[in-house]
A protein has these predicted regions:
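Active-site hotspot residues in diverse enzymes, especially metal/ion-binding acidic/histidine motifs
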Residues: 1-328
Length: 328
């Protein structure tokens, strides 16, 4: 990774490159910045901070933020603050998220024709830029193939957040109908010993272009909207209740995808996050090595819920207690 020029130099470069056509596209802009800065593989946190400083931006890990980051202009200089408490994987993503916002504002100041994007789109654009910058395509595609699209292993090996990785998969596998969802445990009230399925929230929903219109993956699992809760009796519900990964494969339902639902467990063996991946059956090889490694419970709609004995949500459950596929 080489040291780039100043922030202004990059903005002028982005506006001149192919007549500025990349300036309004966060993924292409991220790729352009990656090439400009010479990022050939995912940088560690030190290199990330050094890169931002080399642009003339003052960057600092601060204790006043519980998580995330922020940016501001003060005394003629841009500043980026990020939470000192966060893990490096999260910090890197947040830093590049904030960097996009700084670049975006500067592009507008250089060229008012570059319209400023407002929330909630600004945050989504910034996330896409961060993922595109942090993950060089050829390097990432090789890593995805080796791990079987394992977000956990990729996160550990590349020091990247699961959010960043899911977004990157969606950006790099545009030719297949891929869907990825990240659920987080976010209870409204006091944290209870028995976690309820309605306390999980879909914080990240990634769809490639060919999956945009898909609303239901199978009779037991819909594609959630962002900030929605899992259904009682869904594949996510079964994975959370049982604390084990679940793999849906059906041979008698046409065009049924392979759906891998993986709960991540805390030290106390309680689910705190769930990762859902859905790929076409004919593309299931892209998750096969992960499946072999984590050994999920198979499900195909012909049997009762694998977590039935631990279920506390039998009322309104969409999974037939006696087994069988409940077609909606």
């Amino acid at each position: 990774m080489s040291a780039p020029g100043s922030l202004g130099d990059f903005c002028r470069y982005a506006l001149d490159y192919e007549e500025g056509r990349y300036a309004d596209d966060p993924v292409r802009l991220g790729g352009l910045f990656r090439e400009y800065a010479g990022i050939n593989r995912t940088p560690n946190i030190k290199r990330t901070v050094d890169l931002v400083r080399s642009l003339g931006i003052k960057i600092e890990a601060v204790p006043y933020l519980d998580t995330g980051g922020t940016n501001m202009m003060a005394r003629g200089s841009w500043h980026i603050h990020y939470a000192a408490k966060d893990r490096p994987a999260t910090q890197k993503f947040d830093i590049f998220h904030e960097l996009f916002e700084v670049i975006h504002k500067n592009l507008n100041s250089f060229n008012p024709d570059c319209n400023l994007v407002r929330e909630p789109y600004l945050s989504r654009y910034a996330d896409r830029f961060a993922a595109a910058t942090l993950i060089p395509p050829s390097f990432f595609l090789n890593q995805v193939g080796v791990t079987g699209c394992d977000m956990v292993k990729l996160g550990e090996d590349l020091e990247l957040s699961h959010q960043c990785l899911l977004i990157a998969v969606g950006q790099h596998f545009v030719d297949i109908p891929f869907i990825g969802v990240l659920y987080e445990y976010r209870p409204d009230g006091a944290i209870s010993e028995n976690k309820k399925i309605e306390d999980f929230v879909a914080t990240v929903v990634v769809k490639t272009g060919r999956a945009r219109r898909i609303k239901e993956l199978c009779g037991l699992q819909t594609v959630p909207a962002r900030n929605s809760h899992p259904q009682i009796g869904s594949l996510v519900c079964a994975a959370v209740t049982g604390g084990r990964p679940v793999l849906w494969r059906s041979t008698h339902i046409e065009d049924s995808p392979a759906i891998l639902v993986r709960p991540l467990l805390s030290v106390g063996r309680e689910p705190y996050r769930v990762i859902l991946l859905a790929v076409p059956n004919e593309e299931s090889g892209m998750i096969s090595s992960q499946v072999e490694r984590i050994e999920p419970i198979p499900a195909n709609g012909d049997v009762s819920c694998p977590s039935e004995k631990r279920c506390q949500n039998s009322d309104g459950c969409i999974w037939k207690v006696v087994g069988g596929y409940d077609e909606h």
